[in-house]
Amino acid sequence: DSITKEQKEWVIAYFKHHVIKHINPVIIDTDTDLVSFLKDEFTYLLVNMTDGEEVHHALIEIPTDKLPRFIRMPSEDNTVTFMFLDDVIRVGMNKIFYGLFNYTKIEAYSIKMNRDAEYDLLGNIDRSVLENMSEALKQRLNAMPVRFSYDAQMPEHMVNFMARELKMSSIDSMMAGNRYHHFKDLLSFPSLG
């Protein structure tokens, strides 16, 4: 939030030249099956666009498989400044949705969903443990969500919207968390040397 005008211009240019080609927003409507769409352990931005009573939602997968999670920004002094890829996308959101929807307010919050990871590695005694593990991993791709993590700053109406869309029950875990998810990406933090 505290970047200079020059840095913001650089971020918008970076977004246009490097990021937007990897963004495939999913517009959420009554036909969207988020349970099937969301990938286990991936971080997304849930976008909320409002214009008076009219509300639209979309999901953006953070493309960390194509781009670094941490973007080094130029600075005029000797300081080193990084920005999360999530925030680069937030800065460029109008470039994605302008013209698709009329909105006076646009906001985005991080979310992550985990699927049921219960494995029965010895379930079929006619198969090896490796074959059973392979089958269990395939089942996990289609398993129901059991945990939904979201930015604690996300408005309650958006949390409730996602709980409905993901068909979360009272026994499933919904956890308010930090603005950023998937901290294993810190392992790929660029060297400062």
Residue ranges and their predicted role:
Residues 1-193:
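N-terminal non-catalytic structural scaffold regions of very large proteins
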